[in-house]
Amino acid sequence: MDNRDVIAKLRECAKNLLEVAREMQAADRVESPQTAGLIASEIAPLDGKAHNFALPFVLGRDEFGTSQTIDLALLPHLLVGGGAGRGKTVCLNSLIAGLISTKSPDEVRLMIYDPKCVEYTWVGELPHLILPVITSDSRMLFALRWLDCEMEKRLKMFAKSYCRNITDFNGRKFVQDAGDGTPRTVPYIVVVFDEFADLMTTHGKEVETLVSRITAKARAAGIHIVVATSRLDCKVVTGLLKSNLPGRLAFKTVSSIDSRTIIDDVGAENLYGCGDYLFRSSSEELVRGQGAYISDVELGQLVSAAIGKYGQPKYEEAKE
């Protein structure tokens, strides 16, 4: 046996050992959905590193039981997809809960699109809302136009202050009052689409243009968009939209084609449902996990606590 044969044998042994190690590691993985529900405050306490996140988002636990909390501001936008009843709205509830429990309305404001009219009744008079929960397509289209103008206004204001982004602007050490109404700080804005398909069906081209324009430029302005949908065809999730939504979160899909639409890979069709997800941040590897769950009672308590602490919402004066 010459040296080449020995090297080949060693490589084969190393490969076999790696496979065994992976199988042993897989034995400790979370391989079935935990239907009892995982309270976000229990599985991913927002302390330490997560408290330094601009926009903390509790996803859940990964395959090995490790809590998974990400910073939405770093994604900077997210596409959420999966079949009906597989965990998308519960996931968005977790996002909102994490934001309102750690950030004040001066730090983050929310815009929520709820075409079903019933998914976000629990939000009520949440002080973090920048506008009342939006339930009509025409109103959401107007809100997107307003958001586009707000983005441009912020970027011009940042440039005038010699700042490249919202972090630089809010972190200015010395601020001289220019007398032009420039605020000391501005809040992040998180826009949540609970079901994007309805809007694309009625106002497809303009919505695609606006959302693509905003997502392409809004990171510096502190505006972040989360698009969720159960309709995963090319008329709803277009190539232009996908290119500007680098964060991907897939719940169980009907087919491998739907899986590829969300995460550019197969696998979501084999998930169990009930919050079982695959997550990819930009070009990183897929991470499987079990989504966080917060009960309606807990959500109501969070809203009541926010109202008690910050008062009633101060909506923007956006006129149609």
Give the location of each predicted region.
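Conserved alpha-helical scaffold flanking the Walker A/P-loop in AAA+ ATPase domains
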Residues: 171-183, 214
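Intrinsically disordered, low-complexity mixed-charge segments
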Residues: 314-317
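Juxtamembrane/interfacial segments at transmembrane-helix boundaries in multi-pass membrane proteins
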Residues: 165-169
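P-loop NTPase catalytic phosphate-binding loop
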Residues: 1-28, 33-164, 183-253, 257-271, ...
